[in-house]
Amino acid sequence: MKRILVIFTALIAVHYLTSCSSNPSNRAANEQEETFNASVMLKPTTVKIDGSLSAVLEVVEGEYRLNYTQKLLRYATIAVKIRSNGKGNPNDETFKDYTNGPLSLDVCDKQGQPIAKFSSIGNSYKDDAKLKEMMTKNGEYWVSFDMIVEDNLPKDAATFKIATVNASDLKEAYADVYVLCNTVSAANVAKWDKLLDDFEDSYIQLEALNKKLARKQDAETQLAFSKLDKKVDDLCDSINRACDEKAFAPMQAIRVGRLYSEITKREGTPHQ
């Protein structure tokens, strides 16, 4: 399988990783983890949204489901209903981020204390336009929050709280990412999300086939493996082109880098 030539962000630094080939027999089939899904119901610690948008937005009281999915990476998603009084400013600096805001959600325990590895979950960049419209529209709207997380779903998760993100801090933190990505339009984010989902799912299937071949060689499985390996190569090419064209939104580029990092761990250190 071809390696992905990616933009990789770690500790808010951007690294370029060169592509290389790997022998399918070197895939870490024994390290294959099954996909896993779980969820937990959370209540807001308060309806107040802290920060600069507190005078405009508030959380609608209720229970909300946090979904956790483990594939190559771990993902946490939650949709929260937010009420707007329509008295905000859509041209506020808060809405010029397009990476991870303007809202941030902390998953908390029963006492309302944030759980470290499930904190600062930004609202989905796909909802930034909706939030901007909410500044001048009175009503209740669903806003999604998602992120790649570093740990399993915490057993003590029970509540959450939302705050406004400091846009200037985000701009400084993600400055290197911005110049390498699409920060202008959200028109194609669904297209690129689908590409990355397809790549991640296909790679997991490829690992499963390789594990099966490691147990027993047979022509049918080998043929299926070869076809899927070709598909993954083609998806890699598409990802590389999107990186070259700076087509990914910043959080998508970060996801590509994290996928590359995880695959590198599973397959071993790539040849340069």
Where are these regions (language model features)?
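Bacterial signal peptide processing site
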Residues: S21-N23
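C-terminal motif of bacterial Sec signal peptides marking the signal peptidase cleavage site
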Residues: H15-S19
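Short, surface-exposed binding/anchoring microloops in extracellular/periplasmic proteins
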Residues: L53-L103
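Compact alpha-helical subdomains of small soluble proteins
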Residues: A129-W142, T221-Q272
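Solvent-exposed, acidic/flexible segments
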Residues: Y98, S185-F199, Y203, D218-F225, ...
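Immediate post-signal-peptide N-terminus of mature secreted/exported proteins
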Residues: S25-K71, K171-K216
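Short, solvent-exposed, Trp/other aromatic-anchored flexible loops in extracytoplasmic proteins
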Residues: C108-E172
